[in-house]
């Protein structure tokens, strides 16, 4: 979708002209403000007044445009999204050097308007400074206490697998969309850690909460919201912004009901989940008279939202990619099931089995690599002026560590655009780790739920492949399963249906 089409679709002529005049003033002010002390800037395409390089971008898949631009401008280049300068980092070595070796300088989070309306710089994912440090530290500590990535989580996942199988069985081997049952199952894992209990898949409070969160993730990455992030004064006339705001209002109301229910039965000697721990800390700070505490209602609401969304959408999306890829490539599914049958037999898979299932583990990793569900990462921001690989990048500059360029770096992967599990196998068929495998990002902003996500993917995937043969519907060939995906904040599989055929 072109920029002009996006603007005309959502704005009146008067509003558009007013916005353009405001942009012109900003552009003229900013164009003359560059300090002579600044060093060489990264190269990039010449921007147009007001629009910057927007006419160059495919707004539905901007990461593809960035990847193409790197062929002309190198692994570090800049583009202007309207008046906003954005530095793009491309390739494994460049991204790793920035996020790991220069973690402090590239460690802040850019909070775009579409995310600011959700959190106002509270919570874990979209906050900075001491608030971010305190919330992340508290979340990591308490999630570990409640078994995230450990034995406690394993038991919760194995229990949830049985509920998910029950849902699959209801379709009686007929074609169905895996989206909702998979998302509900994965959401229940984080719900049990955050709230201390799971929900029934028929509970409207739960299903509406999950569906709204998934819709916000999808809509937030739309072309119109990208335009909103650049020209936020267009917000009042954007349909997708209204959808996001409405979902936020309803989700907050439901969340407060759940939190208040936990508050009424709160027992400091018996913490049920993350919310209990936060409420206890909040009460302790209030009783001690601590001023400027970070443990307040807004941080609680947004931390729960962050954990819920991050713990649901990415894992659920990756698992659905994995099932679709098995239907598309039945010969790979054959090898996975042969290995599971030979090593596991009919018993329940456990995390310790991972090292005994090298091919299956390779398939899961290759699914994460090829699915590439967060291709642009979440945007970073420089915390200070920095000279990086000879280029000067000013404090407060938006930085995009292009994860798609890491996971598909041709210098790191033999077949970057193909589904090739051998990327993770040595010549003897044993699993090997790859440094360029970076689906959870890296550095200070690395996904704090990586351990839980890895456990969920392994247990859900192996258990489902142990129980079912996944096929395309009758009359549909594997070639018709599109690998391009649907782009939001994450990249979901294109709409499709699968048949879950029970294995004897």
Model feature map: region roles:
Residues 1-11, 20-24, 277-280, 398, ...:
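C-terminal helix/juxtamembrane-tail motif
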Residues 401-429:
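Conserved cytochrome P450 K-helix/beta-meander segment immediately N-terminal to the heme-binding cysteine loop
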Residues 330-332, 450-489:
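Cytochrome P450 heme-binding "Cys pocket" and the immediately downstream C-terminal segment
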Residues 54-74, 253, 347-390, 410, ...:
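Conserved cytochrome P450 K-helix E-x-x-R motif and the immediately C-terminal K′/meander segment
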Residues 108-118, 131, 150-319, 335, ...:
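Cytochrome P450 heme-thiolate monooxygenase catalytic core
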Residues 305, 427-457, 482-486:
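Cytochrome P450 heme-thiolate "Cys pocket" and heme-binding signature region
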Residues 2-36, 188, 455:
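Terminal signal-anchor or tail-anchor transmembrane helices
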Residues 36-57, 62-153, 177-178, 182-189, ...:
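Cytochrome P450 substrate-recognition site 1
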């Amino acid at each position: 979708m072109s920029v002009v089409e996006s603007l005309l679709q959502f704005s009146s002529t008067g509003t558009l002209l007013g916005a353009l005049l405001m942009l012109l003033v900003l552009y003229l002010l900013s164009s003359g403000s560059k300090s002579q002390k600044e060093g060489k800037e990264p190269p990039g395409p010449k921007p147009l007044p007001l629009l910057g390089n927007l006419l160059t971008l495919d707004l539905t898949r901007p990461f593809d445009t960035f990847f193409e631009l790197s062929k002309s401008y190198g692994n570090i280049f800049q583009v202007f999204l309207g008046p906003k300068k954005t530095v793009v980092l491309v390739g494994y070595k460049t991204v790793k050097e920035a996020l790991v070796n220069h973690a402090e300088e590239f460690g802040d989070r850019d909070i775009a308007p579409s995310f600011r309306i959700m959190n106002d710089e509270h919570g874990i994912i979209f906050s900075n400074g001491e608030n971010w440090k305190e919330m992340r530290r508290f979340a990591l500590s308490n999630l570990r206490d409640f078994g995230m990535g450990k034995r406690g989580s394993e038991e919760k996942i194995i229990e949830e697998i049985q509920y998910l199988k029950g849902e699959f069985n209801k379709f009686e081997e007929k074609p169905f969309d895996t989206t909702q049952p998979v998302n509900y199952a994965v959401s229940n894992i984080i719900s049990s850690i955050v709230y201390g209990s799971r929900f029934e898949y028929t509970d409207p409070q739960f299903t509406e909460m999950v569906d709204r969160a998934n819709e916000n993730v999808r809509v937030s990455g739309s072309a119109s919201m990208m335009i909103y992030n650049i020209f936020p004064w267009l917000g009042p006339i954007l349909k997708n912004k209204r959808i996001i705001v409405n979902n936020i209002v309803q989700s907050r109301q439901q969340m407060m009901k759940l939190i208040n229910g936990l508050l009424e039965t709160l027992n400091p000697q018996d913490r049920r989940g993350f919310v209990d721990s936060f409420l206890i800390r909040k009460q302790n700070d209030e009783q001690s008279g601590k001023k400027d505490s970070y443990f307040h209602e807004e941080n609680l609401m947004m931390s729960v939202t962050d954990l819920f969304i991050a713990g649901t959408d990415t894992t659920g999306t990756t698992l659905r990619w994995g099932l679709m890829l098995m239907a598309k490539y039945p010969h790979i599914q054959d090898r996975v099931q042969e290995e599971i049958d030979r090593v596991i037999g009919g018993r329940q898979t456990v995390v310790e089995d991972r090292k005994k299932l090298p091919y299956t583990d390779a398939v899961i990793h290759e699914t994460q690599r090829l699915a590439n569900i967060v291709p642009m990462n979440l945007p970073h921001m420089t915390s200070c002026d920095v000279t990086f690989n000879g280029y000067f990048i000013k404090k407060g500059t938006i930085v995009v560590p292009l994860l798609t360029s890491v996971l598909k770096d041709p210098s790191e992967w033999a077949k970057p655009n193909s589904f090739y599990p051998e990327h993770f196998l040595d010549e003897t068929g044993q699993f090997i780790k790859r440094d360029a495998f970076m689906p959870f990002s890296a550095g200070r902003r690395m996904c704090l739920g990586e351990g839980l996500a890895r456990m969920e993917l392994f247990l859900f995937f192996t258990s489902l492949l142990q129980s079912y043969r996944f096929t395309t519907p009758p009359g549909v060939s594997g070639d018709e399963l599109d690998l391009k995906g649907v782009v939001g904040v994450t990249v979901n599989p294109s709409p499709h249906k699968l048949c879950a055929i029970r294995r004897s």
